[in-house]
A protein has these predicted regions:
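N-terminal Rossmann NAD(P)H-binding glycine-rich loop of SDR-like oxidoreductase domains
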Residues: 3-26
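NAD(P)H-binding glycine-rich loop region in Rossmannoid oxidoreductase-like domains
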Residues: 51-94
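NAD(P)-cofactor binding segment of oxidoreductase domains
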Residues: 86-114, 146, 151
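Conserved Rossmann-fold NAD(P)-dependent oxidoreductase catalytic core, especially the SDR/UDP-sugar
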Residues: 100-136
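NAD(P)-dependent short-chain dehydrogenase/reductase
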Residues: 150-201, 208
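Glycine-rich Rossmann NAD(P)(H)-binding loop
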Residues: 195-200, 225-232, 281
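Mid/C-terminal beta-alpha module of Rossmann-like enzyme folds, strongest
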Residues: 212, 219-264
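Conserved C-terminal active-site "lid" loop/helix of NAD(P)H-dependent oxidoreductases
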Residues: 234-240, 257-296, 301-303
């Protein structure tokens, strides 16, 4: 029996590493992980790793045509919102041009193209959002991700778009922090913390997002799907819930307005997603925020 081939981009990122974990022991899948540079996942066996620069169309063409995957899960992107605002050329290259290159080669080999998108395509005036709500990005990052969505919807033969919100989790080498570990570390220092009270999100556990990607792949589900956490909260509530979980002092938390932060890019005030479609079609069911904290703390202890 011919094994189904799945290729992912951005395998050194948080979601990419969780996808490797998820597919690692699946004997029915031939799994190809790609990222720029060396493989940073601790397990090097059981799948193929290939270095891939997604801004190089010749490299994309050569590597993807060689492997001929049945499904491409595209996780690589420039996701730092302020960086995208300051380096618009770099953001366009990674978030728009690379998608055009990938869509072109995906079409040529008849691959199912699964693309990761964001709540930042919305202006945040009427969240939580459904898959059919009208986007209106406030930042250049949001603009690039919406442009990529439109390219996929108009040019790709077989596509899925997975929109997500504020992903948290830990990579295997602990090289990157996340909002939960940052909040815990900041609270433990017992110094005053200024946290915004007027931005609302549905934080998404990286493992849940990986499962959402797998469900879309397994069910060959086409179209747009919201895959996020189920608990909507303000950023200050998020930090307070971390404090409650670890029994840390909440009195050091100062609630501030987001316009006092002088951030380069505008953020949507209220996002979060309605998950009805993903629950009904995919059977997606995310963990609670506290269950997510519990999991990443167990992982950080064993690292």
């Amino acid at each position: 029996m011919k094994l189904k081939k799945i290729l992912i981009t951005g395998s050194n990122g948080l979601l990419g590493q969780k996808l490797i974990d998820l597919y690692l022991n699946n004997k029915d899948i031939e799994f190809i992980a790609t990222a720029k540079g060396k493989n940073r996942h601790p397990t090097q066996q059981g799948y193929v790793y290939t270095s891939l620069d997604i801004t190089n169309p010749d490299e994309i063409n050569k590597i993807i045509r060689y492997h001929k995957p049945d499904c491409i899960i595209h996780t690589a992107a420039m996701t730092n919102v302020d960086q995208c605002e300051e380096d618009r050329e770099g953001a366009k290259l990674l978030n728009i041009d690379a998608v055009e290159y990938l869509v072109s080669v995906a079409n040529s080999i008849h691959a199912h193209f699964i693309h990761l998108s964001t709540d930042f395509i919305f202006d945040g005036t009427s969240g939580p959002y459904t898959e059919t709500d009208t986007p209106s990005p406030l930042s250049f990052y949001g603009e690039t991700k919406l442009t990529a969505e439109n390219i996929i919807r108009t040019q790709c033969k077989k596509w899925s778009i997975i929109r997500t919100v504020l992903v948290y989790g830990i990579v295997h080498d602990m090289s990157r922090s996340n909002i939960v570990l940052w909040a815990k570390g900041a609270l433990e220092k017992r110094q005053p913390l200024n946290i915004v009270h007027d931005q609302y999100r549905s934080p998404t556990l990286a493992e849940d997002l990986a499962i959402g990607c797998q469900l879309v792949e397994q069910k060959n589900a086409e179209g747009i799907f919201n895959i996020s956490g189920k608990d909507q909260m303000s950023i200050v509530e998020l930090v307070e819930r971390v404090a409650d979980f670890f029994d840390l002092d909440k009195s050091i938390i100062n609630k501030v307005s987001s316009n006092t932060l002088n951030q380069v890019a505008k953020r949507p005030p209220i996002t979060g997603f309605n998950l009805e479609k993903s629950r009904e079609i995919l059977g997606y069911e995310p963990r609670s925020f506290e269950e997510g904290i519990q999991l990443i703390m167990q992982q950080s202890i064993t690292k």
